[in-house]
């Protein structure tokens, strides 16, 4: 296994380009299954373990792919299988994204129950409910979701999600674009990743109204075409890099971003005392002499993102006072707190709320990643900790951050990647 060895106490400053979004790449890649002919050319796809796993899943289905220099080419003409096996699906929850496209194109699908990050309940019930609304018959047996449609054609329907779900909205969208008739999705997720998926599907020939809102109306079409498309930036990676500069007292300029998609996060950085300036495609952050305590509540977009709460907790260990962090999306997403406390942080969990007491002098030690964003919080803490911090199980980090140690080293960090053996 790999670990990151971080020599703390170095200021993160400089200019860096944001990577393409993982969370928009995955549904876009899944949506290529909807086209029967042609080759897709997808630009700005990040080199990540999750992308590799997902392309392996598509290859298992019969899809042809090539990936070079962040450009993925996909041909879905020769799909041979509608079975997504456990060996691949267990590695990531986003594998469920193939359910909607397979059902829409072939009228059947068999997908293993998914894996992925291990924090709290993340049910797939909403995905299945949406497919059933569109006319699919769903069975769960022997660890698989088996779905089929009479007549092989989904039918338009009204899908009202009881809670906002990015994954379920994406799956419903991909299923509905080839369904017969009109589908209305209410309480749809409005995250930029869903907006990007809508743009992608529309460019393929789908008929979607309400892009960027919580109500989507889809008029099914007969066929969709392969296209060339450029992915959007990764707003969570961008916010994490801003936090790296802020926690170390540095300054940073991020290029290739859309500041409007970072509005909630940038507002909190300002409350924490940072200076923020934006251009049409860049953001600059200048740290204060002393960070100010700033409460956040993670909720669906456009609010503060749940995928940044772990990093914000790490940042607030250096703020001058008490900060309260609440996650309304995943109430139990606090696996990183014991590891941050091992570094010298003083963080308590009270009533599903993290109470961060700062500022605290952190000292390097060995810590273990438990999920993707938790690992990012440990890297941030290691950047400011005195001495050497070793972050184990960084395969979690590699699922969602493209060459993160190289980016941080280019900004002034001293991080090396080393092999280690984990004892059972």
Swiss-Prot record:
InterPro entries: Enolpyruvate_Tfrase_dom, Enolpyruvate_Tfrase_sf, MurA_subfamily, RNA3'P_cycl/enolpyr_Trfase_a/b, UDP_GlcNAc_COvinyl_MurA
Enzyme class name: transferase
Active site: 117 (proton donor)
Keyword Transport found: no
Subcellular location: Cytoplasm
Amino acids binding phosphoenolpyruvate: 22-23
UniProt keyword annotation of ATP-binding present: no
Chain sites annotated for binding UDP-N-acetyl-alpha-D-glucosamine: 93, 122-126, 307, 329
Entry superkingdom: Bacteria
Listed EC numbers: 2.5.1.7
GO CC, alphabetical: cytoplasm
One GO MF term: UDP-N-acetylglucosamine 1-carboxyvinyltransferase activity
Modified residues (2-(S-cysteinyl)pyruvic acid O-phosphothioketal): 117
Pathway it works in: Cell wall biogenesis; peptidoglycan biosynthesis
Pfam families with a match to the protein in the record: EPSP_synthase
Family to which the UniProt record says this protein belongs: Belongs to the EPSP synthase family. MurA subfamily.
Function according to Swiss-Prot or TrEMBL: Cell wall formation. Adds enolpyruvyl to UDP-N-acetylglucosamine.
Listed name of the protein: UDP-N-acetylglucosamine 1-carboxyvinyltransferase
Lineage: Bacteria, Pseudomonadati, Chlorobiota, Chlorobiia, Chlorobiales
